[in-house]
């Protein structure tokens, strides 16, 4: 059974690009347009997800809030979370890691960098 990755971003273009890159490597992809949508999708997935990739700046519930919510839920407390954001300041990176992200990638990015990062957490 393929491993499942949740991709959360308010940009349909980013979702398509990331999803395409991941599907080409054999991953199953579920997408959400913001943190609230992600939480709803996760509640409807009986198997959960193996990894989350999230943007930071999104409407309704941003990436920081999503990560914090997931880390408080024992089902997702140890799920790897990769931030994929255009925010490249040290403060943004540190805040993301402090709230519970596993790693932080900056947009724009190369697909191979994303796949390499995902591969650190999934086999």
Please state what every model-predicted region is.
Residues 16-24:
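Charged docking surfaces used in two-component/phosphorelay signaling
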Residues 31-51:
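Acidic, metal-coordinating helix/loop segments flanking the phosphotransfer/catalytic sites
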Residues 55, 85:
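Active-site residues of response regulator receiver
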Residues 58:
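Receiver (REC) domain active-site loop signature in two-component systems and cognate sites
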Residues 109-118:
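C-terminal output helix
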